[in-house]
Amino acid sequence: MIVKTDMKKVTLLIPVYNEEAMLPTLYQRLIELVNRNAVYEWEILFVNDGSSDTTLECLRRLRQQDKRVNYVNLSRNFGKEVAMLAGFDYATGDCCVVMDADLQDPPELVDQMLEYWEEGYDDIYAKRRTRGEESWLRRQFSLAFYGILQRMSRIDILPNVGDFRLLDRRCVLTLRRLRECERYTKGLFCWIGYQKKSIEFDRGDRLMGHSSWNFLKLLNLAVEGITSFSIAPLRIATVCGVLCSISSFIYAIYFLIKTVLYGDETAGFPTLIIVMLFLGGIQLFSLGIIGEYVGRIFKETKGRPTYIASDYNEEKLGYDR
């Protein structure tokens, strides 16, 4: 006999990549959270993003001992942004809490998120007061990036806000529909709207292991964020081209008048080289910006699935959902 329950279901969504050392500690912290909130039905959903260590075996063991644990195993490493989309596709809860596996985002904050969710908020996000072990340079880079993105984008991209948040089911269903290949999920959270609420917290240090997010990956994410939510770089290139043309015209008029009225000889070769190098640099810069956008269009028009799931729990898949 099937017993119908009126309990709301909460999905904890955790993308993981080479997190074998963190999983036991993470699982214990999550179980403490679950036990404190027994009024809800819980799903602990891990998305294994092509880990090369024993992360998948650890997830299988957790699944064997606790059927509330589900896992999606991607066929290769697609990146955290895509792993989150896979999690949204497989999440079954009335709300979904997105969090990192490194415990820098404390699970204890979920209790307060659930309270705001019950009050009617759709997107309860955690805003960092402090940023833990981050270096001064990385912190300044982050501030500069968000400052640039705020000025270029037409939507309000929130600074010091990561992926750690609770999303109502309708937010999850909306995010499922956004299937672009090159993803900047922090921007998508802001783009979809809905009623939002912030919770401030002090982000701790990573307990063990090291982050896979190096400077180049962060720089690539910054480029994705800017090109996903703004065409301002294209306009900047256009403005630079116009300014260079006007400057060149004024420069030519100046030397023409100087030669005709005063008979001064123009030092042609050095001037020509300087102008050519300057204009060549502007052209290459503009082509690079155009190339970024054309590359994004090329990837989207191929129509490939955003990810391929290899396993869902004990079920072999080998296709995209």
Predicted regions and their residues:
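Structured catalytic core of nucleotide-sugar glycosyltransferases
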Residues: I2-E133
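Hydrophobic helical membrane-anchoring modules
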Residues: I2-M7, Y184-R321
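Short conserved micro-motifs on helix faces and helix-strand junctions that flank
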Residues: P15, L74-R76, R165, T238, ...
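Residues in soluble alpha-helical coiled-coils and helical-bundle/repeat scaffolds
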Residues: Y17-A21, Q104, E108, R176, ...
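Conserved amphipathic alpha-helical interaction elements at protein-protein interfaces in regulatory
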Residues: N18, E32, R36, R61, ...
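Residue-level signature of catalytic and energy-coupling elements of molecular machines
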Residues: L30, G87, D102, I124, ...
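Acceptor/aglycone-binding surface of glycosyltransferases and processive sugar-polymer synthases
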Residues: R61, V72-R76, K80-Y90, P106-L188, ...
